[in-house]
């Protein structure tokens, strides 16, 4: 990490200011050259003109120097607050490169912060999740995780396992001495408790992932029952083509919208029916796949048409699902000839006139999800908690069988999984993969 890196830290485009970030051994040197200053006071904002190597002015800017190790990365950092827009920050960045800086890789500032002990990989992931959060509720949950509760919990579990492993491996070296029964009981209890905690984290994260990522909603029904009209009404703008011709929607259409504090990702599917049209058949197959992926299903029927075999197929398709289903009787402003033979609790509405009742029902259902507890969005971390929990659970059983070597193997597996997200982890190849999806300048 001897080189000095630079990147634009703000979003690209027109704005009032743009921030260029510089980190590394030569950060202060480059800043002094650009500003024609002889010194900078750490953690003070300095208003200055910036010049290129031909002594031509680049911009007037605010410059802030963070002296190592008291900075985001743990290295010397200088941040330049220039005027916004497409050009000024780009010119400044080019000048820094000409002085000897290197363009930063995605997430490289955060990676350096982790390698220098300024944050754990877990906190870095939380910061990235917060940046990418798409709803107020998601931001609230992620911000809560950033306060350190999850990191402290994982570190405590890892420390418990390391201490236990060290003791057990010593006992293996002195095989003639059996572990005291009271100590065996303590270790067994520790394994049971920590396995349970990790299981709660990954099961809660999986069951409530919609609170962070957004709940997936699939609209399903036979052709021409008003699915596209319902999609447009939920989005409050015309996204899908509405036509009296059955089969107009042949592909799945996915859009996002907010209902209260919740993000919803809604999918309008092709009408499900028997068809010889090859393209429509593909659309029907995609519709069925969307049902599998959905968290919530809006099953739409037409109040103005007599129930037929195609409607029955929709009922049959949804008969064994464990997904939450809202049964919708659309076009209820017209003469109602649909017979509710399935005794479903239909929401009666007109997608082209008023869907207030559906929105209220959706909101009540979403509000029933408790946002408390530890939830994570990183699939990698969820899998690590699952693998660790299962390994610790297996270790408990092996301890009861006095298979200490296998017990140690399982504990090692759990420790290595948790260590990837705690403060002592240093494996560059995993960090490269983790931070490769981060923003430039972060």
Curated annotation (Swiss-Prot):
One cellular component term from this protein's GO annotations in UniProt: cytosol
- Residues annotated as transmembrane: none
Query: Where does the source fall among the domains of life?
Result: Bacteria
Disulphides: none
Binding of (6S)-5-formyl-5,6,7,8-tetrahydrofolate occurs at: 21, 79, 118, 442
Entry binding sites for Mg(2+)? 228, 249
Function, as annotated, reads: Exhibits a very high intrinsic GTPase hydrolysis rate. Involved in the addition of a carboxymethylaminomethyl (cmnm) group at the wobble position (U34) of certain tRNAs, forming tRNA-cmnm(5)s(2)U34.
Gene3D superfamilies registered for this protein in UniProt = P-loop containing nucleotide triphosphate hydrolases (3.40.50.300), Probable tRNA modification gtpase trme, domain 1 (3.30.1360.120), tRNA modification GTPase MnmE domain 2 (1.20.120.430)
GO biological process terms, alphabetically, are: tRNA methylation; tRNA wobble uridine modification
Major localization class: cytoplasm
Q: Which residues bind GTP?
A: 224-229, 243-249, 268-271
Residues bound to K(+): 224, 243, 245, 248
Tell me the GO molecular function terms.
GTP binding; GTPase activity; metal ion binding
What is the name of this protein? Answer: tRNA modification GTPase MnmE
Q: Which residues form the TrmE-type G domain?
A: 214-367
Query: What EC number(s) is this enzyme filed under?
Result: 3.6.-.-
Keywords on record: Cytoplasm, GTP-binding, Hydrolase, Magnesium, Metal-binding, Nucleotide-binding, Potassium, tRNA processing
Species of the source: Campylobacter jejuni subsp. jejuni serotype O:6 (strain 81116 / NCTC 11828)
On subunit structure and binding partners, the annotation says:
Homodimer. Heterotetramer of two MnmE and two MnmG subunits.
Give the similarity note.
Belongs to the TRAFAC class TrmE-Era-EngA-EngB-Septin-like GTPase superfamily. TrmE GTPase family.
Per UniProt, the cofactor note for this protein states:
Binds 1 potassium ion per subunit.
InterPro entries the record matches? G_TrmE (IPR031168), GTP-bd (IPR006073), GTP-bd_TrmE_N (IPR018948), GTPase_MnmE (IPR004520), MnmE_dom2 (IPR027368), MnmE_helical (IPR025867), P-loop_NTPase (IPR027417), Small_GTP-bd (IPR005225)
Keyword Glycoprotein annotated:
no
